[in-house]
């Protein structure tokens, strides 16, 4: 049983006594200039390197699942666009079994100047890549997070239910 599965079981037991819900999980472990990660749900892990932004993990939502079906010609574009809940999670902590777990066990070699962004969909789903690049270009980790927060709140989105960003600067 993995560590992620171990923490998922108590959440599942707790939630079944109430209503069906769950949570996403993103975590990174940095050891000897290597970064390892695990993720469940639609929160995102980004690498900001030399002015470019790379998403490292796969988000577990209905849109990505249906997009793959579209790419393999299992559904039409019309069927994809007709789906009512494209942002619905396909995996999260709080289900009896984890359907999807994205992880890197080989380690990504980090370089001096790299920045890592861990964020909820309240950030990655609201800000464009260009906005994320502007935010991640700020002087300090705190400044990056503050700019993201300001950008998200300025949009005044009606269904904004979360806003979490953690920035790690690698020296």
Give the residues covered by each predicted segment:
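PP2C/PPM-type serine/threonine phosphatase catalytic domain
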Residues: 4-171
């Amino acid at each position: 049983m993995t560590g992620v599965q171990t923490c998922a079981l108590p959440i599942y037991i707790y939630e079944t006594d109430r209503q069906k819900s769950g949570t996403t999980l993103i975590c990174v472990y940095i050891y000897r200039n290597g970064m390892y990660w695990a993720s469940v749900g639609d929160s995102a892990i980004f690498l900001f390197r030399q002015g470019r932004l790379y998403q490292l993990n796969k988000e577990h939502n209905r849109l990505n699942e249906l997009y793959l079906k579209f790419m393999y010609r299992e559904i039409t574009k019309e069927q994809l666009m007709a789906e009512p809940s494209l942002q619905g999670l396909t995996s999260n902590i709080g289900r009896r079994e984890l359907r999807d777990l994205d992880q890197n066990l080989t380690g990504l070699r980090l370089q001096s100047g790299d920045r890592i962004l861990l964020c909820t969909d309240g950030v990655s789903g609201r800000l464009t890549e260009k906005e994320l690049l502007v935010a991640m270009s700020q002087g300090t980790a705190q400044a990056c997070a503050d700019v993201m927060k300001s950008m998200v709140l300025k949009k005044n989105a009606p269904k904004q239910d979360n806003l979490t960003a953690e920035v790690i600067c690698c020296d």
